[in-house]
Amino acid sequence: MQTADDPTGTTVLGMLNNCGNGRTPWGTYLTCEENFNGYFGWNDPAFTRNTLEARYGLSQTGFGYRWHTVDPRFDMGVNRNEPNRFGWIVEIDPFNETSQPVKRTALGRFKHENAELVIAPNGRVVVYMGCDEVNEYIYKFVSAGTFDASNPTSAANRDLLSDGTLYVARFDAGATAGDRMGTGTWIPLVFGQNGLDASNGFTSQGDVVIRARQASDRLGATMMDRPEWVAANPTKPGEVFITCTNNSRRGTTPPSSNLADGTTVAGSARPAVDDANPVSYTHLA
């Protein structure tokens, strides 16, 4: 997160490619950074992207905006860490013009579409999210603290998104093939657990959330077909609906998956049609 202009790695100038949204019961707005990779590139032909950059789809020319040709901030050959400062959920207080937006890094870095926030029966804040790209994953964040409904705008409530556990979803087919039924598991993305440690190249919890895609690869999360909008049933805790846009690579050959070592280039895998992801059934296309 550290750059020459921000040696502390704590102050980021602006947001990129804000997509969907969310709202909190304490009166703030959540905006979602999505296709941030398209704004970066590099000018040095000798520059080579690393596995993290490839996994997030960063490329020499980006989306053709050419920002990197006029502003060194967006030239990865000059400021390699700058892309890591984008791809976050940003919390904004629209009712306080002096407030400073906060990138809630505990919620993970990926191509956020929206942020569906609910209060669980135990009082914890839960945020459901999808990474809007083919072969990517569904996530949820659960706060460490609980929501104080008696004082919704309290300072304690306003800090609930800074501390908690990020999870990624894995779906498994049921016992009967073709019945479109199955089970789901939320796997914690926590440094030191489930192989997210130094033996697999992870150095801290900060490293895990910056590399959320690669951490999810390591945990065997289920590849989805652009998990876009997420909505929760307010009358039935735990019931969540997810719209997936498309995946032209699903079912093509040769089949492949996002590799556990995190080296798969973004969007390049060819997942098979399977019962764990019934939306991919060809007869529903």
Description of each model-found segment:
Residues 9-20, 218-229:
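Signature of short aromatic-glycine-proline-rich micro-motifs recurring in repeat-based ectodomains
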Residues 17, 85, 111, 226, ...:
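Beta-rich catalytic cores
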Residues 28-29, 123-127, 237-241:
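Entry beta-strands of beta-propeller and related beta-repeat scaffolds
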Residues 34, 130-132, 245:
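Short loop/turn segments immediately following the C-termini of beta-strands
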Residues 37-80, 143-146, 246-273:
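Short, conserved, GDST-rich strand-edge loop motifs in beta-rich repeat architectures
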Residues 91, 134-221:
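Extended catalytic-interface subdomain
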Residues 282-285:
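Conserved small/polar residues in nucleotide/adenosyl-binding loops
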